[in-house]
Amino acid sequence: MKTGKIIKVSGPLVVAEGMDEANIYDVCKVGEKGLIGEIIEMRGDKASIQVYEETSGIGPGDPVVTTGEPLSVELGPGLIESMFDGIQRPLDAFMEAAKSSFLTRGVSVPSLNREKKWDFKPTAKVGDEVKSGDVIGTVQETPVVEQRIMIPIGIEGKIKEINAGSFTVTETIAIVETEKGDREVQLMQKWPVRKGRPYSAKINPVEPMLTGQRVIDTFFPVAKGGAAAIPGPFGAGKTVTQHQIAKWGDAEIVVYVGCGERGNEMTDVVNEFPELIDPKTGESLMKRTVLIANTSNMPVAAREASIYTGITIAEYFRDMGYAVSIMADSTSRWAEALREMSGRLEEMPGDEGYPAYLGSRLADYYERAGKVECLGNDGRIGSITAIGAVSPPGGDISEPVSQSTLRIVKVFWGLDAQLAYQRHFPTINWLTSYSLYADTIDKWMNGNVAENWGALRLEAMTILQDEAQLQEIVRLVGIDALSEKDRLKLDVAKSIREDYLQQNGFHEIDTYTSLKKQYKMLSLILGYRKEAERALEAGVYLNDILAMEDLKDRIARSKYIHEDDLEKMDQIVVDLKNAIDNLINKGGVANA
């Protein structure tokens, strides 16, 4: 290990000389306390080091020791239910080692527990030919997650020895005989965070990641293996939307990265997730979640690492064949960390002071999402769905981070502060949002939910767009200028907005809606429109139709019908048809 000497300190950036044997992205121990840093630039024998801890008290002349290894994460049993900081230090073990509730500098703790023993059940046997990515056994980490122990990348050969039993993450579970000699395999493996884990092939994502949020699943779906952005001004509900997706999304593993946001938001996750029950497994949501907390009061430089740490952990579970979702809240704070380091490196600034390479760094992150055929001989399919919040100052999405993100992702959930002020949640604006997966997912929905799903979705979306145009006419000349058919359209649009798109995240039934229930709800609202138009054509006055308040109230309350009682909606359809038939038979005398 080569020792250099500090010649300059500028906030989280340290410049050291005598580092000619070091490589870019090597991890260094900086100063007498051995603070963790990473080389981000080399000029001759001078290395610019990004330090992931507070640098006060460090000065020129202090030593810098390079470890010769890139910043890597430990991957193995013990990840699920854990909470790490941006460079994968477990916060509970860190607190015990530091004997403090706050981050103390220079404390070194292993990422995975070295004492805990895990029950390993081999699925391979002595004499089997194995290569990178092959599963050789399993560890039941939580009641929900089974870790599939894989041959590390770069090892290929014949199993010489494999043992069942209880092991710590560093004990040898198998020995593989390779051309270059015997290689030991442990439960744990390391991987550099800035390098994507390899796979056999990338697959086109066609299956939706269901979230139980009606506005997302129906109008702006994201595919398993897709990428989505949630931009919005402060208070519009970015974090709440991400929490809802983390809670109810049908991913098997959730990696939640709190990057530069308030600590209270991570506290909410830690408090809520253990108490919430996953509808699919009946277990606590925490049993499938990995948390990475790099809040706004933690060192800025570690924000940059936290997103890479999160995506590398997600890739590890993807390689086991799991559907993983990663939430990054917020990529804007990560970009601000890039901007700060770029400024300290005295690089030429790009738009609004962000570095010129902002777009490519964002692309590097989002491109690690996707649906893939994993390495190994069993043809496992895994996916990572990346959902990134963007916090543009003042809600202005013309700023560089939002624009760079929108060029990369295929789903845009635009949050609207106006909807938040109206207490309409989720605050996804149906006129500005889009999903480029919608047509592909419509085919899946038509085959798996109902044949006319795509047609219903298109009809509802058209009504909402027509409503925006009709509202302008109403504001100019009043509602009396509209025909009865247009006034009916406004009434149906209001029903779609308030009874379908609006969803109460704190109501035990309304917080999650299955696809079957979504289909029945949308069919009910659009069925009301069809029946009302039939009555108008038969000469019934619109006021008589709008006066059916009891039925309209039942349609509005259909969102609170339990998933086990969906036949009640069929009864509403029958009652609606009978009520319209009665109006037509009576001749519809208006109350005008």
Curated annotation (Swiss-Prot):
Signal peptide span: none
Q: Where are the transmembrane segments?
A: none
Q: Which domain of life is it from?
A: Bacteria
Cite the binding residues for ATP.
G232, P233, F234, G235, A236, G237, K238, T239
EC id: 7.1.2.2
User: Which keywords are on file for this protein?
Assistant: ATP synthesis, ATP-binding, Hydrogen ion transport, Ion transport, Nucleotide-binding, Translocase, Transport
Its Gene Ontology cellular component terms are: proton-transporting ATP synthase complex
The record's annotation in Pfam families points to: ATP-synt_ab, ATP-synt_ab_N, ATP-synt_ab_Xtn, ATP-synt_VA_C
Q: What's an example Gene Ontology biological process for this entry? A: proton motive force-driven plasma membrane ATP synthesis
Q: Does the keyword Translocase apply?
A: yes
Keyword DNA-binding assigned: no
Question: What does the record give as the reaction this protein catalyses?
Answer: ATP + H2O + 4 H(+)(in) = ADP + phosphate + 5 H(+)(out)
Any one GO MF annotation of this record: proton-transporting ATP synthase activity, rotational mechanism
PANTHER family listed in its UniProt record: H(+)-TRANSPORTING TWO-SECTOR ATPASE, V-TYPE PROTON ATPASE CATALYTIC SUBUNIT A
Belongs to which family? Belongs to the ATPase alpha/beta chains family.
Q: Which NCBIfam families match?
A: PRK04192.1 (NF003220)
* Role, per record: Produces ATP from ADP in the presence of a proton gradient across the membrane. The V-type alpha chain is a catalytic subunit.
Q: What is this protein called?
A: V-type ATP synthase alpha chain
